[in-house]
Design a protein with these regions (language model features):
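Periplasmic solute-binding protein
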Residues: 96-107, 126-154, 182-183, 267-273
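C-terminal motif of bacterial Sec signal peptides marking the signal peptidase cleavage site
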Residues: 15-18
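Short beta-strand->loop
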Residues: 42-45, 108-117, 127-128, 131-132, 143-145, 151, 157, 244-266, ...
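A structural signal for short loop-to-beta-strand junctions that line the ligand-binding cleft
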Residues: 86-91, 109-141, 157, 167-170
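Early extracytoplasmic/lumenal segment of secretory-pathway proteins
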Residues: 20-23, 27-101
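Ligand-binding pocket segment of bilobal, Venus flytrap-like solute-binding proteins
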Residues: 173, 177, 184, 188-258
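Mature extracytoplasmic/periplasmic domains
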Residues: 270-331
Length: 343
């Protein structure tokens, strides 16, 4: 997707109500002649790809980035507390449920994302136009090459089967990625069946939940468990890790994308939206358009092993190539937020 064409098409034009916000920030906005152009970014992402994207954006547009980084929940609370005086222009967070939470709090302005389809699938765009995905990640399985046969692994639902008793590693249930996976099960199976599935997972745990996704993969490699739930890119990062122990752990397991013959693998996102009180809405629009350019999408794929949201983007990453393509769940990711409270 060409960045210049995105801007020319007005693909991310903010609705008039958002654009008419009074500019109360000194030197803010592109309308003040001679003032430096800036965009204030509140981001829950902490990846090196983003630093490279910001640098490329500034080089091409002259717009300087003022970056605030914190957890998604902290950013939401900060913007909410600041109210109409918030300096945030763009809010970026990981996990569709957090985007939903920010939307429910009234932190996003509505935007017209229609020009991005069909290059970006409808299920990756908020139906009400408050946010759009900028990168994808799949929540998948990593199983032992020695203790699990490939035909043993099929679906998420199968993990609740008693034959997996004492064999599963997973991080704690309050983790956003696990909550969204369970929310997807609620959306697909209904609350009662999803609750039974979650109880089955707990019954089959090899150990109490601990650590992050990399810890789960290491647990499989060490023999603490036979199969783990993880985001796909952690495994790919371990393959190229500077630590020999992480590389060895990755070699001892196989990454598996479940539900390939049914609903498709569960996909979550990083997403961005323009803040409702953005003092620089046009600069915010340009930054989000740049995130969706081929250049930025390629950086996500090559630097953090994330999956581009724009169809047809080419990248050079053999590790990501090895797990692509796969069948993904096509349910709108906004439903992960809709069912998060139940999960």
């Amino acid at each position: 997707m060409n960045y210049a064409k995105l801007l020319a098409a007005g693909a991310l034009s903010v609705l008039a109500a958002a654009c008419s916000q009074p500019d109360t920030t000194a030197g803010a906005g592109s309308e003040q002649a001679g003032a430096p152009r800036v965009v204030n970014v509140y981001s829950a992402r902490h990846y090196r790809s983003d630093a490279a994207i910001y640098a490329a954006f500034t080089e091409q547009t002259g717009i300087e980035i003022n970056l605030i980084e914190a957890s998604g929940d902290q950013l939401i609370e900060r913007v909410r507390a600041d109210g109409p005086r918030s300096p945030a222009d763009v809010i970026i967070t990981v996990d569709a449920a957090r985007l939903h939470r920010a939307e429910e709090a009234g932190l996003f302005a509505q935007s017209d994302f229609s020009e991005f389809t069909p290059e970006i699938a409808d299920n990756l765009i908020d139906p009400d136009g408050y946010w759009i995905a900028i990168a994808k990640r799949a929540r998948v399985l990593a199983y032992s090459n020695q203790r699990v046969q490939p035909d043993e692994v099929t679906t998420y639902e199968d993990l609740a089967d008693p034959r997996w008793e004492g064999r599963i590693c997973v991080r704690e249930s309050g983790n956003a990625y696990n909550q969204s996976l369970l929310a997807s099960m609620v959306a697909r199976l209904g609350e009662e069946e999803a609750e039974a599935w979650a109880a089955g997972i707990v019954a089959n745990m090899a150990r109490p939940p601990q650590g992050g996704d990399i810890t789960q993969i290491i647990g499989v490699a060490a023999g603490d468990c036979d199969i783990a739930i993880t985001n796909h890119y952690y495994y790919l990062l371990m393959q190229n890790s500077g630590e020999a122990a992480n590389r060895a752990a990755a070699e001892a397991v196989t990454l598996f994308f479940p539900n390939q013959e049914t609903s498709g693998a569960h996909v979550n996102i990083s997403g961005a939206g323009i803040a409702v009180n953005a003092p620089h809405p046009e600069e915010a629009r340009e930054l989000i358009a740049f995130f969706l350019s081929d250049e930025a999408q390629r950086m996500f794929a090559e630097m953090t092993n994330e999956i581009p949201v724009v169809e047809g983007v080419e990248w050079e990453n053999e590790r990501l190539d090895a797990v692509m393509p796969f069948v993904a769940d096509t349910r709108n990711v906004s439903e992960l937020g809709d069912h998060n409270a139940t999960a």
